[in-house]
Every structure is written in structure tokens, then in C-alpha cells.
């Protein structure tokens, strides 16, 4: 039998594993974003949809950080999934589009809402995860004792 393919060897480099985790997470995040974008487009939601995606992604990454996720979970779900799911570039383009259409008040409200709600989402996710993690640990400990 021939030599085993480098991809099938059990001793993959940590960098290759990390890259795979980011790619897998990004694939999931991009597909989730595409699904949300398709649903929002059919409902004519416009920039509200992008703001919603950014807030949800911020909530998720805040929860990940608050739960004390390990480095590999952070790569897969934080860098990968949340990075692909949220969309700063579309937010920026939507803002420019509103400004060039001379909808200054709407542009200002959009920028303010996106930033404040996203930061609030990250803070809420972080706080809730910090509060829930010890409770889950106690429940798991109680379940294992019985």
C-alpha cells in the first residue's frame, strides 16, 4: 500500500486545523447570512436586515467571549461564523447610499442604530453568558451526582 495522504495523517499542523475551523465556521456563517438576506429581501427590509444581522452576530460573539470559549471555538464561531454572518462592508455601503441619496437623517439614524445596537448586543451576550455559565456548571454537577 502507498504512503498515506498528508491530509489523512493524524498529525496535522495546528495552523492547518485552525484554518479548517475558520473555513468551516465561515461557510456556516455565510450560508446563514445568505438565508437571512434572501428572507429579508423578499420582505423588502433593506438596511434593517443588515442591522439585524450585525446585532445578532454581535450578540453571538459576545456570548462566546462571555462563556470563556477556548481558542479553537473562538476561531470557528467567532472569526469564522460571526465574521461571515455579520457584514460591516454592506453596512458601510448602505450608509454611503443613504448619504448620496441625501437621506441624511436616515443615514445618521442607521449608523447610530447599527453601532449602538451591535455594541449593546455584544455586551448583552457577554453578560448573559457570564451569568448562565456557572448555573449550567452547577446543573451538570448535580446531574452527574445522581
List the predicted regions and their residue ranges.
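Membrane-interface helix-loop junctions in multi-pass transporters/channels
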Residues: 1-146
